[in-house]
Amino acid sequence: MNVDSDRLFTSWFYGLGNVYLYSKFKDENIITDRHFLSNFAWSGTEDNIEVYDLLVKKLGFPALTVILYANEKALFARLRSRDENDSDLDKVKKAKEKYEKMVFFCEKYEMPYMVIDPSELTPEQVVELIMKRIEGRA
C-alpha cells in the first residue's frame, strides 16, 4: 500500500482505518499510534486535503496528539538496530519534512498537540511530560 503513488487513494485507505477505529471504540478513551498525522504526513497533498477536512469534521480529533521527534541520526540508528536492511531506512531523509507536515496538520485543524524529543529522556520521563500536559500541569 505504501508504494502506491495515488495519494487520493492512500489518503482514503488509511482514513478508513481511522473511521473504523473511531466507530469500534466510540466513547472510549484510547491511545493510538499512526493517527491522521501519519496519514497526512505520507499521503497528504493539496489535491486531497478535502479527505482530511471530512475526516476531521466527521470524526473530530484526539484530546491530545503527541509527536515524538527524533533527528535523522537518531532515527537511522534506531532503525539499523532493529534491522540493518530495514526498508524504512530510505525514509529517514524525509523525516524533517514529515514532522513539519504533522505540525502543520495540528495547527490547521487547531488540534491540541505537543512535540517531544525523547533522545535524552527515559520512557518514564516521556510519559510524565505527557501526563503533565493531560492533567493541565504543563
What are these regions (language model features)?
Residues 77-86, 90-138:
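NTP-dependent small-molecule kinase module
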Residues 28-29, 62-63, 113:
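Conserved acidic residues
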Residues 36-37, 70-75, 121:
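Conserved nucleotide-binding/hydrolysis micro-motifs of P-loop NTPases
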Residues 32-34, 68, 116:
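Active-site flanking residues adjacent to catalytic metal/cofactor-binding acidic residues
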